């Protein structure tokens, strides 16, 4: 009879321990109930990107001197710069400039090392297409400034997203 009593006591202790673990999990669940949601409703709400966000590259054709520094500092030699040497003035004339965003890793080296500041990073991050050949932007497409998230009246911007504590 003595082993049966100890087994019953062990069973009771295990039951109490299991109830305590369930209670701890339930308390954690309840503590998260009064927090704000971390996710946003993406197409209808957008986060305002930070100042240093590295989005699509903007190119100013008039400022470019075709020095090809952007090509040399790019880890994957991505920008394609076509130029012609003007012999009478002994300067390069830019003919075509293009970047394939399907290959670009958005490192920002081209923007950082450009001597004339003709390249800049924008806040545009919606570059998805059904055809990857549409991601090859020429100087005309690179010259378009994106519509600012703040100016877009069709979406609601989320300014204060709660910080995630780890």
Swiss-Prot record:
Pfam families: Fer4_9. Binds 2 [4Fe-4S] clusters per subunit. Residues 55-84, 95-124 form the 4Fe-4S ferredoxin-type domain. It catalyses: a plastoquinone + NADH + (n+1) H(+)(in) = a plastoquinol + NAD(+) + n H(+)(out); a plastoquinone + NADPH + (n+1) H(+)(in) = a plastoquinol + NADP(+) + n H(+)(out). It is a peripheral membrane protein. It is found in: Plastid, Chloroplast thylakoid membrane. Its cofactor is [4Fe-4S] cluster. [4Fe-4S] cluster 2 binds at residues 74, 104, 107, 110. Belongs to the complex I 23 kDa subunit family. NDH is composed of at least 16 different subunits, 5 of which are encoded in the nucleus. This is NAD(P)H-quinone oxidoreductase subunit I, chloroplastic. It comes from Eatonella nivea (White false tickhead). The lineage of its organism: Eukaryota, Viridiplantae, Streptophyta, Embryophyta, Tracheophyta. The gene is ndhI.
